[in-house]
């Protein structure tokens, strides 16, 4: 499996396989990732702004993941790796084989929360011991939906908050076109921060940088998180904006 390119308007995502498919495949995958990380855009800047590594929270063996992070990504990502690498542990709900997940409140109970926090600490420690970097992983659950059942995501707002935060300020606003307006998706989190508020704050930083279509864009940002946000967004967009140039033409990803 090669690195695949996905385009959402001017947002470009590169999806790469991990390691663990055998020595020859691992060498091939590593070379592809290294090549992409070292690629520059037309302005001589790194093509890749940030790297998101998703780990399987239900797996006990993360050896190949550590090799990917410590030996492939970190040595080749360039400057400020701690601000450009995001590690997310998925399937938090089944990390202990489904035990201690409170389905009613859609969150981990204390036993599972302690287990997940220890896994976060372990991943952080292993990376630090190998590279000297302090990268703080997070855990989340993507949720699921089928014709019989549904489970909302958990900590997805935290993941999005960090993705937006790690994206250069002048490029953040492009996310506004692709964030779901379904409030249930963003409702459940560890509540360490008000992540929805922080996401809006980060997006408005882009508006303040001059990337704006005035009240219309401000309103679109606000709509992502409810009626109050929409009103505030329109006011902020109207005050800050007024530049009626298309957002798409302002990004070159």
Segment roles from a protein language model:
Residues 1-12, 17-212, 238, 242, ...:
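Conserved GTPase G-domain substructure that encodes guanine base recognition and part of the catalytic core
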Residues 210, 214, 218-237, 241, ...:
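Periodic glycine anchor positions in long extracellular repeat architectures
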Residues 227, 252-253:
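C-terminal or otherwise distal, non-catalytic regulatory regions appended to signaling enzyme catalytic cores
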């Amino acid at each position: 499996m090669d690195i695949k390119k996905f385009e959402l308007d001017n947002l470009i995502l590169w999806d790469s396989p991990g390691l663990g498919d055998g020595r020859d495949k691992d060498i091939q995958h590593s070379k592809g990732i290294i090549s992409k990380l070292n690629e520059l855009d037309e302005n001589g800047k790194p093509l890749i702004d940030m790297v998101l590594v998703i780990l399987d929270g239900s797996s006990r063996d993360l050896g190949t993941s550590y090799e990917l992070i410590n030996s492939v990504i970190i040595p080749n990502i360039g400057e400020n790796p701690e601000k450009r690498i995001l590690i997310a542990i998925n399937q938090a709900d089944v990390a202990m084989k489904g035990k201690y997940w409170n389905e009613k409140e859609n969150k981990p109970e204390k036993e599972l929360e302690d287990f997940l926090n220890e896994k976060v600490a372990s991943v952080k420690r292993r990376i630090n011991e190998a590279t000297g970097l302090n990268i703080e992983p997070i855990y989340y659950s993507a949720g699921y939906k089928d014709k019989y059942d549904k489970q909302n995501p958990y900590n997805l707002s935290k993941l999005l908050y960090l993705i937006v935060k790690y994206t250069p300020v002048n490029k953040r606003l492009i996310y506004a076109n692709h964030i779901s307006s379904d409030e249930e998706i963003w409702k459940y989190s560890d509540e360490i921060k008000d992540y929805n508020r922080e996401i809006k704050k980060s997006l408005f930083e882009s508006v303040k940088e001059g990337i704006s279509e005035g009240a219309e864009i401000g309103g679109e940002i606000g709509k992502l998180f409810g009626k109050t946000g929409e009103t505030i967004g329109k006011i902020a967009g109207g005050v800050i904006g007024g530049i009626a140039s298309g957002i798409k033409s302002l990004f070159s990803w």
